[in-house]
Amino acid sequence: RILRDSEEKPSLLDALDEFSMSMAKAGALLIHYRAHFIKRLCQAAPAIHGDFSGGRERLTLRYETVSTVTDPEAGPQVIFQQLLQHQEEHRAAEIASRQCLSGPHKDDLLVEIDGQAAKSYASQGQTRTAALSLKLAAREIFQQDTGEYPVLLLDDVLSELDPRRQEFVLNRIRGGQVFITCCEDDRLPQLLGGRIFHVKNGTVR
């Protein structure tokens, strides 16, 4: 808001240094913890994706942050100084564009399938498989840390999967509480063995 409104209220820029300092401090912590979580995803998700795709595809993950952060897994104080450097280098551009160009909101998780960027080259089925692999990997990490599975919500994930991949997902989510939504599938009772809720005209039965 400081940058956005600074043209009409130049005095707002007086608070920019203090705000940037606070943002860099919080951003450094966020980048640090994100990087360590993504490192764990990198250990869990590719194996799940390999099983999911029948060994035909290779999933890789990479955390991309601002250019001055040389190691996202470094200590927060190191990242803090590097974020401040990025802010200083881009201060003029930020004021001119009235947009914040430095910080964890600019980060991205790069997902690649067989060395190609998923967001540019993956099919809808490949994208769905990669997303499910990440979700299942995060679920396993949660279980490792807490000793129990989180409640898992899967919204209409089975309709676009072939029978083999449907079976893989259903076998992989055993344990814990799982909610799966779908439009129509007469095979669900046999596949799941759980309770079935029907929603019609806003009424659950």
Feature roles, as predicted:
Residues 155-157:
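Walker B catalytic acidic pair
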Residues 6-151, 160-164, 168-171, 177, ...:
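Conserved NTPase motor "head" modules and their coupling/switch loops across ABC/AAA+ ATPases, GTPases
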